[in-house]
């Protein structure tokens, strides 16, 4: 099937979906209605661009016909030639855009995410940088109109974060933040540095798509659930009733502890949401590693321990090492203006996939 047959098939299916979504039987079936609505939304842009492309093709045919009929009318002929020239340029642009739109979609792109940030090498300075990254993503989410909820945070005593887990909810969150997983390096002079020397520290970021219970079922026999008293500053028990929850997935030894909420059930629900995402991500990463062993990985699926970005404070510089992008906009980026970086990563990823497809 060539590209035009594929595009026509997408348009035919889009029209079929429009009819199905107005069918009372489909509307009354919530699960099916949501699935078909998602499918329609995913193909909407492709269909819109394809229809514009077909109009441009028609414009070319009309202009060619006009040139034939314009003998003896130089002004009309010149106008038709200009229309033909512009339409041919537009046709090439639409064809390029359609090739990208036909690339296989990541099924997780529309999902919410679980975001984990940990201070790594560098002690207190790494924990402070983890806090900076949290603030950066929080502001970026705000700019995108997403909901950002800190689910669990572990402070280090100097205003930094040893670890933080957040849920980011909204439209196409994973499609934009999936490239953030990896090691983020910071180069700056710590407040405690009397000699003015630049120190290097690292924080790690992990982005996982939210996994619904119906999508990934964990056998209850594989879980150990401990209930205990939540502790406050200094380790004292802050609740008379045990509300804190620890869940361990025995086959992988993945552990989640939750004590932020006031009730055991709410802590359990949040812990299950995180552990479901972590376990699903664990097995997805194993499968991805096997796949990457056979072919070169794209930017979106690199080694989780790979250093992906450096934030250099003295030079106000941010460098993304995967695509060789350097921007002298550190202040702006840390204040949540990540669009230029993320757009470049998406374009690079799509270009790599297109090259892979054309091999």
Swiss-Prot record:
Keywords: Cytoplasm, Methylation, Protein biosynthesis
Principal localisation: cytoplasm
Post-translational note: Methylated by PrmC. Methylation increases the termination efficiency of RF1.
Subcellular location as annotated: Cytoplasm
N5-methylglutamine, modified sites: 236
Keyword match Chloroplast: no
PROSITE patterns, A to Z: RF_PROK_I
One Gene Ontology CC term in the entry: cytoplasm
Pfam families, per the entry: PCRF, RF-1
Annotated GO MF terms: translation release factor activity, codon specific
Role, per record: Peptide chain release factor 1 directs the termination of translation in response to the peptide chain termination codons UAG and UAA.
HAMAP family on file: Rel_fac_1 (MF_00093)
Sequence similarity: Belongs to the prokaryotic/mitochondrial release factor family.
Name listed for the protein in its UniProt record: Peptide chain release factor 1
């Amino acid at each position: 099937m060539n590209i035009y047959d594929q595009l026509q098939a997408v348009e035919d299916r889009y029209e079929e979906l429009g009819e199905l979504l107005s069918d009372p039987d489909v509307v009354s079936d919530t699960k099916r209605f949501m699935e078909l609505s998602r499918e329609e939304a995913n193909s909407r842009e492709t269909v819109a661009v394809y229809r514009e492309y077909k109009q441009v093709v028609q414009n070319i045919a009309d202009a060619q016909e006009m040139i034939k009929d314009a003998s003896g009318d130089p002004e009309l002929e010149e106008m038709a030639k200009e229309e033909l020239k512009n339409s041919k340029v537009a046709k090439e642009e639409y064809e390029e855009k359609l090739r990208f739109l036909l690339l296989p979609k990541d099924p997780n792109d529309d999902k919410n995410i679980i975001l984990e940030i940990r201070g790594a090498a560098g002690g207190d300075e790494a924990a402070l940088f983890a806090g900076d990254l949290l603030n950066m993503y929080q502001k970026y989410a705000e700019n995108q109109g997403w909901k950002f909820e800190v689910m669990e945070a572990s402070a280090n005593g100097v205003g930094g974060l040893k670890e933080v887990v957040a849920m980011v909810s909204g439209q196409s969150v994973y499609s934009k933040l999936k490239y953030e997983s990896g090691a983020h390096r910071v180069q700056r002079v710590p407040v405690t540095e009397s000699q003015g020397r630049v120190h290097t520290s690292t924080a790690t970021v992990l982005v996982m798509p939210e996994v619904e219970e119906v999508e990934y079922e964990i056998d209850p026999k594989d879980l150990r659930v401990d209930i205990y008293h939540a502790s406050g500053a200094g380790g004292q028990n802050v609740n008379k009733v045990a509300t804190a929850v620890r869940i361990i997935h025995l086959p992988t030894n993945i552990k989640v502890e939750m004590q932020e909420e006031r009730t055991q059930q709410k802590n359990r629900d949040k812990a299950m949401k995180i552990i479901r995402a972590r376990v699903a991500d664990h097995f997805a990463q194993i499968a991805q590693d096997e796949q990457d062993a056979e072919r070169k990985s794209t930017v979106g699926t690199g080694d989780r321990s790979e250093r992906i970005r450096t934030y250099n404070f003295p030079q106000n510089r941010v460098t993304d090492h995967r695509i060789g992008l350097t921007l002298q906009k550190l202040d702006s980026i840390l204040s949540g203006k990540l669009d230029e970086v993320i757009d470049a990563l998406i374009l690079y990823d799509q270009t790599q996939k297109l090259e892979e497809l054309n091999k």
